[in-house]
Amino acid sequence: MEADFAVELGPQDETLELPWSAGEEGPRYYDLKRQPELLLEIEEARAWPELGEFLAAVNASPNLLETAKCDAWATSEINPEEEIFGAACKFGSYVDLLFSPWASRFSFMEHEQLVKRITQLLKRVPEIPAAAELIIRRCFYHATGGVEDGFYLTFYLFGYGDDEAQARQRWGIALKLVENAIRQIAAGVNA
């Protein structure tokens, strides 16, 4: 599996407001760490069970992370750097990840250590036509006392194949490998 990380903290880069909402009737933030039953409210988790399993695992109590947002999709648009997979199709997803410990959300060093550790573990997994990228971004945490400027991670994952079914299957396998890497890191932190 290809695995890499990046830092995007410029003024034009993506940010996250937490909690977030797309309007009264639209999608919104659900605190799955503290209310796991709300997983049933997330359309993407219902549409793609593999993503639902990943969200449940990441938000499980002993884990050091929790999720804020997600999506998944299939496309036949292959970027030049993805041509190495020799695929006609890709299935992709993103999940926005937050540290569960409040203080860790404001530590760039902890975010950087985490993305380095995850990418190191993923580079050791068996060869699979998949690519993961973790991006450190700015998050604005809205709390009772105002807004605090911190960080979060966007985790992109793509599986590649000759058709959508094969690409999705490879994406699902890669998603389990990432889940296992996060569990290993969490086990080391909680030991």
Give the ranges of each region predicted by the language model.
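N-terminal low-complexity, intrinsically disordered segments
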Residues: 1-90
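Generic intrinsically disordered, low-complexity segments enriched for polar/acidic and small residues
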Residues: 2, 26-27, 96, 137-138, ...
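Short, structured coil/loop segments at alpha-helix boundaries
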Residues: 41-55, 101-111, 163-164
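Short glycine-rich, basic-tinged beta-strand/loop micro-motifs
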Residues: 85-104, 151-155
